[in-house]
Swiss-Prot record:
Lineage: Bacteria, Pseudomonadati, Pseudomonadota, Alphaproteobacteria, Hyphomicrobiales
Recorded name of the encoding gene: leuC
Keywords recorded for this protein, A-Z: 4Fe-4S, Amino-acid biosynthesis, Branched-chain amino acid biosynthesis, Iron, Iron-sulfur, Leucine biosynthesis, Lyase, Metal-binding
Domain of life: Bacteria
Species of the source: Mesorhizobium japonicum (strain LMG 29417 / CECT 9101 / MAFF 303099) (Mesorhizobium loti (strain MAFF 303099))
Protein name: 3-isopropylmalate dehydratase large subunit
NCBIfam families from the UniProt entry: leuC, PRK05478.1, PRK12466.1
Length: 469
């Protein structure tokens, strides 16, 4: 009888093509997502060596990082470097026979949103992309992680990837979430608990009642930020919620193929007694709405808390780092989070740009008006999300309140397009990173949930969504 295995063990082992004595493995890759930023050199490498894309049908390309989200984007991209990257992806996809979603395609959007929408992402698969937030797809019980440009070329050419097996970590969130606390708060709390290096060398499996109770979109938010906790990937075992989400997607198996896939997917659970190298347990009932205060995703505190005092940190290097973060953020220890005034609000990204995120924001916003000193924008994660939101009338709620309603793309998550902060502007953002300069030179980012961001836009400062009327 074989030893009990974790979900990660099972998926990894099922995809090993070759294993060396030193533990290095060659893994078969089921799905490869490609965008304009990390792929040009990879395609050029194929071209120079006379190679083809080995499995174009397992590859899907989309523009997301550099595209404008302005309604005027049909007139083209102003920035020359960004325009060249977008044009290069269109040409490379055509030359190598890869399916491509341009900015004029209703299916276009952020790569980690369009994969699940199309059923390109399925349980039990190995999925890679030249993007760190590929871990998002782990919400489906898939082994998904980012790769570098040289690895992008390797996967395009061979449909395989050289890997070493990571260690197993279990993060269990027990109990039920309180009203007003979301998947975004869960993952920020986890990162606050383990730190941004806590998951280094691990693949995290998320489990527990609070995780199981989440929708697929909530689960994607959790897995999306696994990388911010230092992990290689994040996984949530597939269940009936997963199967219901996947079933009618365009690329999902049909008929007998669906039945066979379902039978296999149901085996992809961690066995009882499977060994985890590290276990973290959180009590969902004790989690508050969370706001980041510094320049690292681990710098988090309850919305009812205060900006911490770095002088109380005993580790000298960490203390110095947090003092720098406070200086960058323009904050003073002891300041109430609810006293922090805002200039900008961004609702979108591969973390929180899906239809449920927009519904949550609309529920808070309806009948209200954006604070006069706040510039607020909502960016749907894909053309299909935008279409659905408009069918539900959410755009009218946003526009009536004074929000900008944009075209799909990565937008203000990162300063690679026209949507960015000016120096010292302070932003409540539903994205995943609050690094220095992430949203623009000297821009100041606070990570929050969509409902918290929406309420902050109306109030002009952070408020506890649990008290929102």
């Amino acid at each position: 009888m074989s030893a009990p295995r974790t979900l990660y063990d099972k998926i990894f082992d099922d995809h090993v093509v070759d294993r060396q004595d030193d533990g290095t493995c060659l893994l078969y890759i089921d799905r490869h997502l490609v965008h304009e930023v990390t792929s040009p050199q990879a395609f050029e490498g194929l071209r120079l060596s006379g190679r083809k894309v080995r499995h174009p049908e397992k590859t899907l390309a989309v523009v997301d990082h550099n595209v404008s989200t302005s309604p005027e984007r049909k007139f083209g991209i102003k920035n020359e470097e960004s325009r060249i990257q977008v044009e290069a992806l269109a040409k490379n996809a055509k030359d190598f026979g890869v399916e491509y979603y341009s900015e004029n395609d209703i299916r276009q959007g952020i790569v980690h949103i369009i994969g699940p929408e199309q059923g390109f992402t399925l349980p039990g698969m190995t999925i890679v992309c030249g993007d760190s937030h590929t871990s998002t797809h782990g919400a489906f019980g898939a082994l998904a992680h980012g790769i570098g440009t040289s690895e992008v070329e390797h996967v395009l050419a061979t449909q395989t990837l050289i890997q070493r097996k990571a260690k197993n970590m279990l993060v269990r969130v027990d109990g039920q979430l309180p009203e007003g606390v979301t998947a975004k708060d869960i993952i920020l709390a986890i990162i606050g608990e383990i730190g941004t290096a806590g998951g280094t060398g691990y693949v995290i499996e998320y489990a527990g009642e609070a995780i199981r109770s989440l929708s697929m979109e909530g689960r994607m938010t959790i897995c999306n930020m696994s990388i911010e906790g230092g992990a290689r990937a994040g996984l949530i075992a597939a269940d009936e919620t997963t199967f219901a989400y996947v079933k009618d997607k365009p690329r999902a198996p049909k008929g007998a193929a669906w039945d066979a896939a379902l039978a296999y997917w149901k085996t992809l659970q961690s066995d009882e007694g499977a060994h985890f190298d590290k276990v973290i347990v959180l009590d969902a009932a004790k989690l508050p709405p969370i706001v980041s205060w510094g320049s690292s995703p681990e710098d988090v505190v309850s919305v009812q808390g205060v900006v911490p005092n770095p002088e109380e940190i005993t580790d000298e290097n960490k203390r110095t780092s947090k003092i720098r973060a406070l200086d960058y953020m323009g904050l003073t220890p002891g300041t109430k989070i609810t006293d922090i005034a805002l200039d900008r609000v961004f609702i979108g990204s591969c973390t929180n740009g899906r239809i449920e995120d927009l519904r949550a924001a609309a529920k808070v916003i309806e009948g209200k008006t954006v604070n006069p000193r706040v510039n607020a924008m909502i960016v749907p994660g894909s053309g299909l999300v935008k279409e659905q939101a408009e069918a539900e009338g959410l755009d009218k709620i946003f526009l009536a309140a004074g929000f900008d309603w944009r075209e799909p793309g990565c937008s203000m998550c990162l300063a690679m397009n026209d949507d960015r902060l000016k120096p010292h502007e302070r932003c409540a953002s539903t994205s995943n990173r609050n690094f220095e300069g992430r949203q623009g030179f000297k821009g100041r980012t606070h990570l929050v949930s969509p409902a918290m961001a929406a309420a902050a836009a109306i109030a002009g400062h952070f408020v506890d969504i649990r008290d929102w009327k």
